[in-house]
C-alpha cells in the first residue's frame, strides 16, 4: 500500500499544509494520480491512499485504488 499526503512548500522551502491546488486543480490531481499509478506499477503496489489535508481537524480521503 502506498500513502500520499499532498503538502506545499513555502517561500523558506519548508513543508506546509497545501492551501489550494492553484488555477488548475483538476490538472494537479491528474498529475498526482498519473505519477502514483506509474510508481504503483513499477513497484507492484496494489493500493494507494491519497490525502489532501483541509484543516487540522479533518482531511479528504480518496478511496484506495486496487489494481
Curated annotation (Swiss-Prot):
Domain of life: Viruses
Protein name from the UniProt record: Uncharacterized 7.4 kDa protein in Gp54-alt intergenic region
Origin species: Enterobacteria phage T4 (Bacteriophage T4)
Gene that encodes the chain: y12B
Amino acid at each position: 500500500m502506498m500513502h500520499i499526503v499532498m503538502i506545499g512548500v513555502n517561500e523558506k522551502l519548508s513543508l506546509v499544509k497545501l492551501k489550494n491546488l492553484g488555477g488548475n486543480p483538476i490538472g494537479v490531481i491528474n498529475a498526482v494520480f498519473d505519477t502514483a499509478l506509474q510508481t504503483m506499477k513499477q513497484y507492484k503496489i496494489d493500493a494507494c491512499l491519497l490525502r489532501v489535508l483541509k484543516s487540522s481537524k479533518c482531511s479528504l480521503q480518496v478511496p484506495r485504488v486496487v489494481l
